[in-house]
Amino acid sequence: YDLQVKLALAQDRLFGSEQVSGIAGRMEAIAAVNGAFFAATGRPLGLLMIDGELISEPYASRTALGLGPKLAVMERVGFRGEVTLDDGSRLTTLQGLNRPRLQDELILYTRQYGTTTNTNAFGLEAVVLDGEVVRIEQGNSTIPPGGFVLSAHGVQRERLGQLAVGDRLDVTV
């Protein structure tokens, strides 16, 4: 037998709900279990990584389970992210990933979040594609396929405001 353990999102999106039997059928699974906590919106509460892509950040110092081909690990994990300019200098740090932006935060939005950031106009957003800032907007930016959006408020807005269209940057989490 060639059995694998796979993770899946309800309806293949961050905000979704679906019966476990539906996910199992879509994934052609022989067994399935709901192994996550999630909000009423369907958003996972806690660390979620699928096929090497970070989908959501850790939540409230909860323990996370990591499964590899020959190893399973349970640990408390934290979140750390940085925005680095092309010259190697650090612009700022991230406060979160694929969740609503709060006061004085910088949040990274990927397509796993949806097609737009769904943020208000009190922030500043840099739309990034292939490592290059392609647009600067106030809020509710379209998240490009293969790219991401950095969304800032308050103090972080000032830092993100240093960017211009054409600037190159890298984000690490």
Please describe what each predicted stretch is.
Residues 1-173:
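Gly/Ser/Thr/Pro-rich low-complexity, intrinsically disordered segments
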